[in-house]
Amino acid sequence: MKRTLIAAVLLTGLLAVQAQEKMSREETLQIAFYTSLDLKAMLNTPIPTDPDVKRPVAIKDGDYGGLVLPEAKLSADTFANAGKEAKSVGQIWLRGLAPMHAGEVVPASKLRTVHVNAGGQEADAVCCALGVCKDANGALELVIYGKDKEPVARAAMKVISGQQENPIELSAERKDDSGVLTLKFLGKYEAAFSVTAPEQ
């Protein structure tokens, strides 16, 4: 019963909340476990990924949810040694949301959707590999992948200074009919990208 309820929180959005909130560690670990049950689907990403399901972060807002899994060996060197080719920094799983590019939702045909079975509850989630690379000007950028090796979205990275509990922290802000997801990496870098309801 407990497992089914936890799954429903993220995968079917049965618990409505007034604003985005960070999910408890217990809930988040359960969700990460469910996403990893089908390893073939989880790891079938355009760039190689090795997500750490023991250090996840998840947020929810009504029918919407996001789960971020850091790369297992994510470190400051990942960013310091970044070049033109993207290096994985993790994965983000989205429920009821899809990335945006140039003000428009990324078409469903370009996104990788994974069917998740969580203790009797079933739902589809968009799974995006996350990478870091340098743009043409040598600046760090976050690249977000769908099905193909060409990223579906990009976001500039800025340097920050702070302490954080997890390798990647995730927060969200509503903006009319869309939202902005902000990712903080190791307390050293930050990137944000827009999301909205997925294409029907």
In which residue ranges do the predicted regions lie?
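Sec-dependent N-terminal signal peptides
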Residues: 4-13
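Residue-level detector of solvent-exposed, low-hydrophobicity positions
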Residues: 12-13, 100, 135-137, 152, ...
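C-terminal segment of classical bacterial N-terminal signal peptides
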Residues: 13-19
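Mid-length scaffold segments of soluble, non-membrane domains
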Residues: 83-149
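Primarily secretory-pathway and cell-envelope proteins
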Residues: 19-96, 114-116, 147-200
